[in-house]
Amino acid sequence: MYKLFFRLVFKRMDPEQAHYLAFRWIRLAARIPVLRTFVAAALAPRFKELRTEAFGLRMHGPFGLAAGFDKNAVAVDGMSMLGFDHVEIGTVTGEPQPGNPKKRLFRLVPDRALINRMGFNNEGSAAVAARLAAREAVFRTVVGVNIGKTKVVPEEEAADDYVKSTERLARHADYLVVNVSSPNTPGLRNLQATEALRPLLSAVREAADRTVTERRVPLLVKIAPDLADDDIDAVADLAVELGLDGIIATNTTIAREGLGLKSEPTLVKETGGLSGAPLKARSLEVLSRLYARVGDRITLVGVGGIENAEDAWQRILAGATLVQGYSAFIYEGPFWGRAIHKGLAARLRTSPYATLADAVGADVRKSA
């Protein structure tokens, strides 16, 4: 039914307008107790065998919503209602900003992909922190907070901007993510170089520890799929050195060649980050390389091109303790989370692994 609705309605709408329309429906459903309970019972099944622990946090399962969908933390319970075991909000910047001019979001339907150049449009760290502080949680959902650089802040002052966001948001975050990999903020990806990344991550870690003294807020970094292999290794080594809790692999790609894209050339040439199915192979490759480098010393989160339970399972075998999705949600609709959970539970039952944790990195260990 959703796929028919997508073809007849959403496909004819501007992608960003369709996003906000769907978003309003999700928020509305989450506000009505009877409807919320009914939807969660139907779309958010719980499987004991999928229970997951990552960086000290317990979750119903490994499957979460990637950053970018709920930028301002307005629908955390709504997304949990749809079956996401954790919700990563943001990207949130130190100061509010409108993002890049519209049109800035494009569907590549034949490729089951998106191109976006949103530019971190969000209400800013102060407003999002206030909303999280006032939130009365309906569902027990792990909330990650993804932070990025305000566009007008010079690159040399980036650490101060990230620290500002950390000081405002850390106490409301189950985990924090430093996003240095979006292609839509000029100069941001330069911060992935270890000489820039080391002081940035150190500053954020210190700010989080200074702000939240009653617990240690897990800190992760999100990297691009376009990094060279040597740079991936360097980030992995730095994460171990600094005692980071995790790495998220990967963000969107600026590449277009070699992806077998079938959409109209005018769409393919749009500037921005490409996400969805064409990213699958490279994101899996980056994840496997990271796990081979860090093993179980750091928690890995697999994202990029995950469309179904088999994709999620392959990420787990490649080293991901958690998996995330976003683009396929646009194409698959509200039953997507349920399908991922049911498929993963079935896959685990027919596998040689007693627990989901046993499966993490199994393929990489076999090939070592």
Swiss-Prot record:
To which pathway does this protein belong?
Answer: Pyrimidine metabolism; UMP biosynthesis via de novo pathway; orotate from (S)-dihydroorotate (quinone route): step 1/1
What would you give as a GO molecular function for this chain, any one? dihydroorotate dehydrogenase (quinone) activity
Q: Which domain of life is it from?
A: Bacteria
What Gene Ontology cellular-component terms does the record carry?
Answer: cytoplasm; plasma membrane
**What's the EC number here?**
1.3.5.2
User: According to its UniProt record, which cofactors does this protein need?
Assistant: FMN
Q: Give the primary localization class.
A: membrane
The record's free-text note on cofactor binding: Binds 1 FMN per subunit.
User: Species name for this entry?
Assistant: Streptomyces avermitilis (strain ATCC 31267 / DSM 46492 / JCM 5070 / NBRC 14893 / NCIMB 12804 / NRRL 8165 / MA-4680)
Q: Does the keyword Cell inner membrane apply?
A: no
Tell me where the signal peptide lies.
none
What is the recorded function of this protein according to its Swiss-Prot or TrEMBL entry?
Catalyzes the conversion of dihydroorotate to orotate with quinone as electron acceptor.
What is the protein name given in its UniProt record?
A: Dihydroorotate dehydrogenase (quinone)
Q: Which SUPFAM superfamilies match?
A: FMN-linked oxidoreductases
Localization in the cell = Cell membrane
Does the keyword Kinase belong to this entry? Answer: no
